[in-house]
Amino acid sequence: MANVVENLGKLERRVTISLPKDTVQKEIDARIQKLAKNVRMPGFRPGKVPLKMVAQQYSGQVEAEVLSDKIGQEFFTISRAENLRVAGQPSFEPKQEQAEDAYAFDATFEVYPEVKIGDLATAEVERSTTTIGDAEIDRTLDILRKQRVHFHARGEAGEHGDGGADTAAKNGDRVTVDFVGKIDDVAFQGGTAEDFPFVLGEGRMLPEFETAALGLKVGEQRTFDLKFPDDYHGKDVAGKTAQFTVTMKKIEWPHLPEIDAEFAKSLGIEDGDLTKMRAEIKENLEREAKRRTQSIVKNQVMDALLKISELDVPKALIEQDQQRLVEMARQDLAQRGVPNAKDAPIPAEMFAEQAERRVKLGLVLAELVKANGLEAKPEQIRAEVDEFAKSYEDPKEVVRWYYSNQQRLAEMEAFVVESNVVDFVLGKAKVTDKEVSFEALASASAQA
C-alpha cells in the first residue's frame, strides 16, 4: 500500500506508520526470552527465573523499546521509498484511533528545502589588497620593542641612569602609587591599594585617575573626584562619584631596546643580520595580511550568496545548531576556568539569529558545491596543510599532526571547500579591488 505523505506547510510533513501487532508481539516475546537468560531475581539462580515472571516485570519496558525500534525502522523505510530528505529528527505520536490488529503512529518531520541560488553575476564583493612596505615593518619593530621594554627608576645611576630623580611622571612611565577612595566618606571594596603599579597612557586605569597621576613627583599626592561610568563592571560603584587621594611612590622610565644584532637574535635570527630580520618580518606580515584579506572577502562572499539565494530554513536544523552553539559557549567558559561551566544556564534563544544564518549558509554552500563540483581535492588539502605548517619551527611535524587526526583533517577540508566556493564566486561576481593599510585591514578583520 502506498504511503500517504501529508503536506503541513512549506517544509513540514506528516506520515502515518502502521505496525502489525502480531509482528510487534513476536519481537517482544523474542526479547523477553533473551532477557530471561541473564535476569536475576531473589530466590532464583541466574537464567532460571520463570518466563512468566520475567514478562510480568519487564514487558512494559521491552514493549516500549520494541515500538521505538520498529517505528524508527519503518520511518526509515518509508523515507527511502518516498525519497524524503528528512531534516532533523522526526517526532512520533500515537494516533487517537487505533486499529485492533495494528499500532498506528503519526510521524511529523521537516524536509530539506529547495535552494535557489540567484545570478552570481549580480553579486557585489569588495576585495581588499594590502602592500607591506618599510612603514609596516618599522611599525611592527616598534611594537616588538615595546613588548621588550625595561623600566628603570628615575635618577638611577649607571648605563640606564637619567639623572631625573625630581622628574614628574609622564605618559609612558611606569608609576607605583598608593591610593584611597571613598564614596560619601565611606571606603568601598577595591577602592584602596598600596604599591599599585601601572603604565601611564596605556588606558588600564580610568582617565580621571591617570590624569591625576600625571605630573606628580615621588612623595607628592593629589586628591580628586572620579565618577564611575554607568556601565562600570563594579556594580556597587557604577554611576557614583568617589573622592580619591593618590600618592606617588615610584616613577620608572621606559627603556626600549636598540634595533641591533642582539635584538635580531631575540627574534630568532641566529646571525643577528638586520636585513634578514626585516625580510622575515615582511614575510610574516604578508602571510598575516593574506589570511586577513581572505577572511574578510570570504565573509563578503557568504553575505552575497545569502542575499541572492532563496530558501526556507528547517526549524529542526536551527534548533540543533542552537544547541551546538550553547555547548560551544559552555566549553569556552570551561576553558576560561568558570566553575560548573558544563551546566551553565545559557538560553538557546540567544543564538537563534546566528544559528539560522549558519544553517542557511550551510544549505546554500552544499547546493553550490554539489552543482559546480567544488569539493576539496586531496592535493588541495595537502597544499593548505603545508602552507599552514610553514609558520612553525618544525613544518613536517605539523603536517604529521594534521594527518594523524581525521577531525583536524576534516576541518582543513571544510576550509578548502570554502576557499573553492570563494574563488568560484569571485570568478563570476562584480569584484572591486580596494587598497587598504595593514592597520585598517587588521581593524576590519577584527570586526568581521
From Swiss-Prot:
This is Trigger factor. PROSITE patterns: FKBP_PPIASE (PS50059). Keywords: Cell cycle, Cell division, Chaperone, Cytoplasm, Isomerase, Rotamase. Belongs to the FKBP-type PPIase family. Tig subfamily. It comes from Burkholderia cenocepacia (strain ATCC BAA-245 / DSM 16553 / LMG 16656 / NCTC 13227 / J2315 / CF5610) (Burkholderia cepacia (strain J2315)). InterPro entries: PPIase_dom_sf (IPR046357), PPIase_FKBP_dom (IPR001179), Trig_fac (IPR005215), Trigger_fac_C (IPR008880), Trigger_fac_C_sf (IPR037041), Trigger_fac_ribosome-bd_bac (IPR008881), Trigger_fac_ribosome-bd_sf (IPR036611), Trigger_fact/SurA_dom_sf (IPR027304). Consists of 3 domains; the N-terminus binds the ribosome, the middle domain has PPIase activity, while the C-terminus has intrinsic chaperone activity on its own. It is an enzyme of class 5 (isomerase). It is found in: Cytoplasm. It comes from the Bacteria. It holds the Pfam family Trigger_N. GO terms for cellular component: cytoplasm. The keyword Glycoprotein does not apply. GO terms for biological process: 'de novo' cotranslational protein folding; cell division; chaperone-mediated protein folding; protein transport; protein unfolding. One of its GO terms (molecular function) is peptidyl-prolyl cis-trans isomerase activity. Transmembrane segments: none annotated. Its EC number is 5.2.1.8. SUPFAM superfamilies: FKBP-like, Triger factor/SurA peptide-binding domain-like, Trigger factor ribosome-binding domain. Involved in protein export. Acts as a chaperone by maintaining the newly synthesized protein in an open conformation. Functions as a peptidyl-prolyl cis-trans isomerase. It catalyses: [protein]-peptidylproline (omega=180) = [protein]-peptidylproline (omega=0). Residues 172-257 form the PPIase FKBP-type domain.
